[in-house]
């Protein structure tokens, strides 16, 4: 992939400072907007890797589209200046160890890695990239190196790393806008919100940004809420779920580039599609069976009465992925990321950009042996025993989600806030982690006519770690297909591809 790199005027240091200066006026008597402030306890849960979201546009005039992006990013930084800052380690002593903070004013970092980079790929098309459904880890990492603004192998132990950067890639048939963010600074929903704000400013440079609550205020509010929570607010033992990565975390921090390089030869990324009509069939069949299974689900008021599409797809992927590698023939565990924003019942947190996620955990039983699918085409319906097991797993997933109420969230916040070493409060890893971006309306964003209005595609790129499953944002397609992004060991691809349940679900779409 041949490239040419240029830098946009939006990256100039004085322009970023203009955005910061506008915030000083409205914060009289408060700490200056360029002073560092602490990340919340929730920000210390995920591994602080770089994650990239890519939006693909069919722009007839890409150079004019770049100008629109420049103006939009300038407006975005005026509303949220911390996005141009860095995530750093505090130099002063505090009551906790291994904490992180945001340093909004980071001119040296901006000079080294501009806010918006522009790269030309005259020999590569969006269509060509989208056609690559199964990628070896090394090729996936090379694509990220070319298209993303921040290095995939940026050392995790660096004392200072950017919160967020953009790169506009001018392809042979359009523009790919890549946004890379530090996972300790925001979660997927926050990143999707940033792209939504950028779309507003690109479509209408005069879009108002009044009433924006400063990021530092919202992050500190989370920890104030945690301080007010009773340690006994929930009966759950959160130490089992928030125990960090232990020695593995130190290993990653010490040799992140080497770790990625080694994993790149072992893993593949797989983008596949489940037709919408199959998900609807499963939802109808499983909900019809649900009433007969409720007696097996202890929990009283937490017994689910209806299963959602997300419940069904999550259970389906758990049943498929339990066939991979060392999981085959064994019971395992599924984790699901849950956005807590709706539970706070505060409008300000609806637009919060930082981390606001917890994980639920669901046991997954070992798979039973199945006969291979005969013939070139899988059956149109699933076997009754498959439907019954799928219903049971989906119901337990829904049951775990129903436990996430106000009391449970208070217990999580209280537990995290009470810890003195925040390197040990990371999420506990499981063999099958799943995150759903299904309701992130990124494909429906309107960036204005210059960029071709709505993106025509979305891609997720992140370090190839293995064992991950993402449900991608819903496409603007009346058939409502379900797109997924998997990371597997290369030896597991054929095993999964020949699994009868996978063959039924994906069919000719993989």
From Swiss-Prot:
<dbReference type="InterPro" id="IPR023213">
    <property type="entry name" value="CAT-like_dom_sf"/>
</dbReference>
<comment type="similarity">
    <text>Belongs to the fumigaclavine B O-acetyltransferase family.</text>
</comment>
<keyword id="KW-0012">Acyltransferase</keyword>
<dbReference type="GO" id="GO:0016114">
    <property type="term" value="P:terpenoid biosynthetic process"/>
</dbReference>
<comment type="function">
    <text>O-acetyltransferase; part of the gene cluster that mediates the biosynthesis of pyripyropene A, a specific human acyl-coenzyme A:cholesterol acyltransferase 2 inhibitor. The first step of the pathway is the synthesis of nicotinyl-CoA from nicotinic acid by the nicotinic acid-CoA ligase pyr1. Nicotinyl-CoA is then a substrate of polyketide synthase pyr2 to produce 4-hydroxy-6-(3-pyridinyl)-2H-pyran-2-one (HPPO) which is further prenylated by the polyprenyl transferase pyr6 to yield farnesyl-HPPO.</text>
</comment>
<dbReference type="Pfam" id="PF22664">
    <property type="entry name" value="TRI-like_N"/>
</dbReference>
<dbReference type="InterPro" id="IPR054710">
    <property type="entry name" value="Tri101-like_N"/>
</dbReference>
<dbReference type="GO" id="GO:0016747">
    <property type="term" value="F:acyltransferase activity, transferring groups other than amino-acyl groups"/>
</dbReference>
<dbReference type="InterPro" id="IPR050317">
    <property type="entry name" value="Plant_Fungal_Acyltransferase"/>
</dbReference>
<comment type="pathway">
    <text>Secondary metabolite biosynthesis; terpenoid biosynthesis.</text>
</comment>
<protein>
    <recommendedName>
        <fullName>O-acetyltransferase pyr7</fullName>
        <ecNumber>2.3.1.-</ecNumber>
    </recommendedName>
</protein>
<keyword id="KW-0808">Transferase</keyword>
């Amino acid at each position: 992939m041949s490239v040419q790199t240029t830098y946009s005027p939006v990256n100039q240091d004085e322009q970023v400072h203009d955005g910061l200066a506008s915030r000083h006026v409205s914060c009289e008597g408060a700490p200056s907007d360029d002073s560092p402030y602490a990340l919340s306890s929730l920000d210390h849960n995920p591994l602080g890797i770089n994650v990239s979201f890519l939006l693909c546009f069919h722009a007839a005039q890409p150079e004019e589209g770049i100008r629109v992006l420049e103006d939009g990013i300038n407006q975005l930084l005026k509303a949220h200046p911390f996005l141009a800052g860095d995530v750093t380690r505090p130099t002063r002593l505090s009551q906790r160890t291994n904490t992180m903070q945001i340093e909004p004013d980071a001119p040296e970092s901006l000079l080294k890695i501009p806010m918006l980079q522009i790269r030309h790929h005259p020999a590569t098309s969006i269509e060509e990239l989208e056609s690559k459904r199964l990628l070896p880890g090394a090729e996936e990492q090379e694509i990220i190196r070319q298209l993303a603004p921040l290095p995939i192998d940026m050392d995790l132990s660096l004392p200072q790393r950017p919160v967020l950067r953009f790169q506009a890639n001018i392809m042979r048939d359009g523009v790919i806008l890549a946004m890379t963010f530090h996972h300790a600074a925001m979660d997927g929903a926050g990143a999707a919100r940033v792209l939504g704000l950028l779309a507003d400013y690109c479509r209408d440079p005069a879009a108002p940004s009044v009433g924006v609550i400063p990021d530092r205020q919202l992050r500190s509010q989370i920890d104030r809420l945690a301080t007010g929570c009773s340690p006994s607010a929930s009966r759950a033992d959160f130490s089992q779920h928030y125990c960090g990565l232990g020695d593995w975390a130190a290993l990653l921090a010490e040799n992140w580039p080497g770790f990625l390089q080694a994993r790149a030869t072992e893993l593949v990324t797989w983008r596949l599609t489940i037709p919408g009509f199959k998900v609807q069939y499963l939802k109808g069949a499983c909900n019809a069976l649900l009433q007969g299974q409720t007696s097996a689900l202890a929990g009283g008021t937490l017994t689910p009465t209806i299963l959602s599409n997300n419940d069904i797809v999550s259970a389906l992927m758990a049943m498929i992925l339990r066939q991979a590698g060392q999981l085959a023939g064994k019971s395992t565990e599924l984790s699901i990321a849950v956005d807590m924003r709706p539970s706070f019942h505060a409008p300000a947190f609806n637009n919060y950009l930082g981390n606001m996620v917890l994980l639920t955990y669901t046991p997954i039983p070992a798979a039973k042996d199945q006969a291979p699918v005969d013939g070139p085409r899988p059956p149109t319906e699933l076997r009754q025993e498959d439907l019954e097991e799928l219903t049971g797993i989906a119901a337990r997933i829904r049951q775990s989600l129903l436990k996430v109420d106000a009391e449970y969230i208070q217990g999580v916040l209280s537990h995290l806030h009470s810890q003195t070493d925040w390197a040990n409060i990371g999420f506990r890893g499981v063999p099958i982690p799943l995150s759903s971006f299904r309701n992130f309306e990124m494909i429906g964003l309107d960036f204005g006519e210059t960029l071709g209005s709505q993106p025509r595609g979305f891609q997720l790129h992140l370090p190839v770690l293995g064992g991950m499953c993402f449900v991608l944002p819903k496409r603007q397609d009346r058939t409502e297909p379900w797109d997924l992004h998997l990371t597997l060991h290369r030896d597991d691809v054929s095993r999964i591809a020949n699994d009868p349940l996978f063959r039924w679900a994906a069919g000719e779409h993989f």
